[in-house]
Amino acid sequence: MKTFSAKPADVTHEWFVIDATDKVLGRVASEVALRLRGKHKAIYTPHVDTGDFIVIINAAQLRVTGAKALDKMYYRHSGYPGGITATNFRDMQAKHPGRALEKAVKGMLPKGPLGYAMIKKLKVYGGAEHPHTAQQPKVLDI
């Protein structure tokens, strides 16, 4: 019997919505990364994008455990000498709700063209409203 390999034309991408209110950052991110890759499906093939679209609402209410709200740091560099900037989780959530979740999920996905296509299927919104009601996303409870 031949090994099954999914074809991109045969894959159907479903839409799911996740309410992130009072959910822990890492637990949501790991489940989202798994579903973006498509590893929850029986037709999973590593070199084909078999994942689903994920819409996350209320990302501003995500939480972290312990003292990580102040201790967890995000770094970026301007490219100039001495141009490193550090931001903690609390400030990141206040300024850009959901960006911490996007960075966490992106770090869990493969690097390269396939991983870049997977991260485009993630839609994160800080509030309860999202513009994807036409896709009729199913509620996914984590």
UniProtKB/Swiss-Prot annotation:
GO CC annotation: cytosolic large ribosomal subunit
Keyword Ribosomal protein present in the record's keywords: the answer is yes
Keyword Protein transport, does the record have it? no
Q: Name one Pfam family in it.
A: Ribosomal_L13
Keywords attached to this Swiss-Prot or TrEMBL record, sorted alphabetically, are: Ribonucleoprotein, Ribosomal protein
CDD domains, per this entry?
Ribosomal_L13 (cd00392)
| UniProt GO molecular function | mRNA binding; structural constituent of ribosome
GO biological process, alphabetically ordered: negative regulation of translation; translation
The record's InterPro entries line, in alphabetical order, gives: Ribosomal_uL13, Ribosomal_uL13_bac-type, Ribosomal_uL13_sf
Summarize the subunit comment.
Part of the 50S ribosomal subunit.
Task: Give the similarity note.
Answer: Belongs to the universal ribosomal protein uL13 family.
Q: What does this protein do?
A: This protein is one of the early assembly proteins of the 50S ribosomal subunit, although it is not seen to bind rRNA by itself. It is important during the early stages of 50S assembly.
* Name of this chain's protein: Large ribosomal subunit protein uL13
Phylogenetic classification of the source organism? Bacteria, Pseudomonadati, Pseudomonadota, Betaproteobacteria, Burkholderiales
